[in-house]
Design a protein with these regions (language model features):
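Basic nucleic-acid-binding interfaces
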Residues: 2-37, 47-86
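Minor-groove-contacting beta-hairpin "wing" of winged helix-turn-helix DNA-binding domains
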Residues: 42-46
Length: 86
């Protein structure tokens, strides 16, 4: 891991409760593209899998909610596994 997004992901794994909302958005946009919905305290990203799954990120006084950070990390891990395994 060496790039800025990789460093953010490492920080997210270390302390999911301390993730800035803007950083979570930055990571999600890198992996899943533009948000499907934004403009409120919630930002929704569509996942590339069947069934229309989503990752929802919610601004909680400048921080992303820890449970949503973990969901984002799980989605990134799944995407990386699928790319690796074909």
């Amino acid at each position: 891991m060496s790039g800025p997004i990789d460093r953010l992901i490492a920080q997210m794994r270390q302390a999911p409760r301390a993730v800035r909302f803007a950083d979570a958005i930055k990571v999600a946009e890198r992996y899943f593209g533009a948000a499907r919905q934004k403009g409120s305290s919630h930002v929704v990203f569509k996942m590339p899998w069947l069934g229309d799954p989503r990752v929802n990120l919610q601004n909680d006084r400048g921080k992303a909610k820890a449970c949503q950070v973990r969901q984002l990390l799980d989605a990134i891990d799944k995407l990386n596994r699928e790319e690796r395994d074909g």
